[in-house]
Amino acid sequence: MVFVTGDLHGNFERFKPKYFPEQARMTKQDIMICAGDFGGVWFGDSRDDETLDWLEHLPFTLAFVCGNHENYDALERYSVAEWHGGKVHRVRPHVLHLMRGQIFELESYRFFTMGGAKSHDIEDGILEPDAPDFERRLTMLQRKPRARYRVNHISWWAQELPSDEEYAEARRNLDAVGWAVDYIITHCAPTSIALMGSRHNEADRLTDFLQEVRERAKYHYWLFGHYHDNKAIDEKHILLWEQIVRVI
C-alpha cells in the first residue's frame, strides 16, 4: 500500500491510530508519503530525536519530499542511500527524505519526486543572525502585528529551491524513462496551477520547471501540498493538506 498526505509542519497527530486506523493492516513494506513541509527535522539536534523515534516506530515507512519549511542544513547531514531505485536521505531506517529529481519504483509504479517551493511568508524580510543590527530588527518585527519574516539558517534556507545540479539530475532521470511515470509528488504546483490560487502565488524557476514536466511528461496522477487545502484541481492533479489518500 502507498498513501500520500500533505504538509505536516512537525505535527504528526494524523498518524495516531484513532485518526488513521488503516495502519492496523500496514507493515514497514507499506509507505506513507508526505508532499513536503515535513518539519520533523527542524532543530537539527537531539531535540528532534523523540519525534523521529516515534515516527520510526509507526507500523509503516514514512517518506517525504522537502518543502520550503525544512531545515536543509540538517537534512544534508544525513547519509545518502539508494532506495527503490532513487536517492534518499535516511533520517531513520524507515523515515526517509525522497531527494529531488528522483524516480522510485514502488509496487511496480514509477514515482517522480521534486520537492521544494519558494516561501511567500517573508514580506518583512529575511534576517541575518550575524548582522550587527539583527537584534534591533528582530525586536522591531516582533512588535509588529502579523509580521511575516524569517531568519536565515534558523527558520529559512536558500535551499528551499533546487540547485542547478538537482534540475539536471531530474532531467537525466526523466530522460532515462522517456518522461513516462505513474505518479508525480511535489510540494508546489506547476505554474499554471499555482497561479490559479492565492494572489500571493507567483511563478518562479521551480514552478516553471514543473510546468515543463506537466506539458512533457506522461503520468496518471500528480499530488502536491504547499497551498493548505484539500482539493482535486482536475482528474489528474490533487492538492493535499491534512487529508490522507491511498494511491496504491
Regions found by a protein language model. Give the residues of each.
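Catalytic metal-binding/acid-base residues of hydrolase active sites
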Residues: L8-H9, F38-G39, N68-N71, A117-K118, ...
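Active-site-proximal beta-strand elements of phosphoester/diester hydrolases
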Residues: M1-H9, S108-A117, I185-H187, L239-E242
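Short loop/helix-cap segments at secondary-structure boundaries that form the rim of catalytic
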Residues: F104-L106, N230-H237
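Core catalytic region of metal-dependent phosphoesterases/phosphodiesterases
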Residues: T5, G10-L106, R199, A203-Q211, ...
